[in-house]
Amino acid sequence: MDNKYTMKTKFFITTLLFLIGGLCLKAQTNDTDTQKAIATLKEFYKVIYDDNLGRKEEQFLKYVSKELFNKVFPPSPPGEDNSPGYDPFIQAQDYEAKTLNRSLKITSLGNDRYRVCFLLSDWEKKKTCVDYQLKKNNKGKYMITNILSDKNFYIRPKK
């Protein structure tokens, strides 16, 4: 009789250990994905909002989905400018690159959503925050697919 309970106990403990191990592995994967997404956002701001570079479509498309890029920068006929009156990625027109990148703070909001906060200049006291959704592309690289905090550029999920 003791042997029967011992086997059940061993089976229960073994099953419990497998479940705990699986949960730990999933948590590590989620943490790694979060770190990769945050690194993508840091790199985006460093590359795009650098004083020494002119912003080009190719640079944006390394970090921003084509759908979001076309919503933010719609194609316009020659001689016309259909671009927004502000930059939705910084919620402003003007910024100081060094201050912006030095003050950059990125936090995960869960479910592939992230909040990026920064100062636009040294004289600014209030941080600007922008909420994003990032998703992996077919190559496994995180891309900014939505600006959640800007109703002008929010892309409604497809049903």
Show which residues each predicted segment covers:
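Bacterial Sec-dependent N-terminal signal peptides
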Residues: 1-32
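N-terminal leader/targeting signatures
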Residues: 7-8, 14, 65, 69, ...
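Surface-exposed, charged secondary-structure patches
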Residues: 32, 73-126
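Hydrophobic beta-strand residues in large extracellular and virion-surface proteins
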Residues: 41-44, 104-106, 114-118, 132-134, ...
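Generic signature of mature, soluble extracytoplasmic domains
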Residues: 42-57, 65, 122-123
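Short, well-ordered alpha-helical segments enriched in acidic and aromatic residues
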Residues: 53-80
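Short beta-strand edge/turn micro-motifs at domain boundaries
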Residues: 127-159
